[in-house]
């Protein structure tokens, strides 16, 4: 009787844990960008945040959604991509408005010019939306034509998670080039590391496609490498640290 009562209690507890993990998976990825968004709004200065972070995450999550049509995976991972896309669009909108307001003599640059020198440096948020829609349309059409190819679908999934996994590499390279982590927020990197570790464990425990687990592990390794740089360059400085960058740019460049 006691065992039955305990079992009755454990079933809803297991469901609550599952729902909590799914919720953390869906919304956890955007948490680091909330203080960054608030900081940009408060200071009206977006120089410390690279909009290329938005580009990488938009491409990665659009490809992940397209991958879902070829091979269904956990619903929380699909909703995570939707939430991240909306978050990055909000970040782009704010950054564009702030930059245009601060640059009085800004020459208007539009997506329809197709000028590679000004790519992702346009004057209006609408141009970024046009670019995202164009990429989604082209990638979606190619996926529609190739959806029956298992090789294409698996490659699409790999490209999606590999793109996201490479997000920390520019920071890793910047630290190595300057032989310093001055201006980089250690708290942010720790947050990325814990988030990527949780995400990878979620992939492994829920039987997500292999690409997700492999690239999740790669993300964790990149995060740990950045933390290793912070330890080495702080403990054994090789040269005077360069001018401090804005903490919000930690994973941007």
From Swiss-Prot:
Designated name of the protein: Solute carrier family 66 member 2
GO process terms (BP): phospholipid translocation; retrograde transport, endosome to Golgi
Primary residence: membrane
Domain of life: Eukaryota
Family annotation (SMART domains): CTNS (SM00679)
Domain PQ-loop per the UniProt entry, residue ranges: 14-80, 160-215
Subcellular location, record wording: Membrane
Cellular component terms (Gene Ontology): cytosol; endosome; membrane; trans-Golgi network
Membrane spanning stretches: 7-27, 49-69, 72-92, 125-145, 150-170, 214-234
Naturally occurring in which organism (per UniProt): Bos taurus
Keywords, in A-Z order: Membrane, Repeat, Transmembrane, Transmembrane helix
Bilayer topology term: Multi-pass membrane protein
């Amino acid at each position: 009787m006691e065992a039955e009562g305990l079992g009755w209690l454990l079933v809803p507890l297991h469901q609550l844990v599952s729902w909590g993990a799914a919720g953390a998976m869906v919304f956890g990825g955007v948490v680091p960008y909330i203080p960054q968004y608030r900081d940009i709004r408060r200071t009206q200065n977006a120089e410390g945040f690279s909009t290329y972070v938005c580009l990488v995450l938009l491409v990665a999550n659009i490809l992940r959604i397209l991958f879902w049509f070829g091979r269904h995976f956990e619903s929380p991972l699909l909703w995570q991509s939707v939430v991240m896309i909306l978050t990055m669009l909000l970040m782009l909108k704010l950054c564009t408005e702030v930059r245009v307001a601060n640059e009085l003599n800004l020459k208007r640059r539009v997506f329809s010019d197709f000028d590679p020198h000004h790519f992702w440096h346009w004057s209006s948020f609408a141009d970024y939306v046009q670019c995202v829609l164009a990429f989604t349309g082209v990638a979606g059409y190619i996926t529609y034509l190739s959806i029956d190819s298992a090789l294409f679908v698996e490659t699409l999934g790999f490209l999606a998670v590999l793109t996201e996994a490479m997000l920390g590499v520019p920071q890793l390279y910047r630290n190595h080039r300057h032989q310093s982590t001055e201006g980089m927020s250690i708290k942010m990197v720790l947050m990325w590391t814990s988030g990527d570790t949780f995400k990878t464990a979620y992939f492994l425990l829920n039987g997500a496609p292999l690409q997700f687990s492999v690239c999740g592990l790669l993300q964790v390794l990149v995060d740990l490498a950045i933390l290793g740089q912070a330890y080495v360059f702080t403990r054994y400085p090789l040269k005077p640290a360069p001018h401090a960058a804005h903490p919000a740019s930690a994973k941007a460049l």
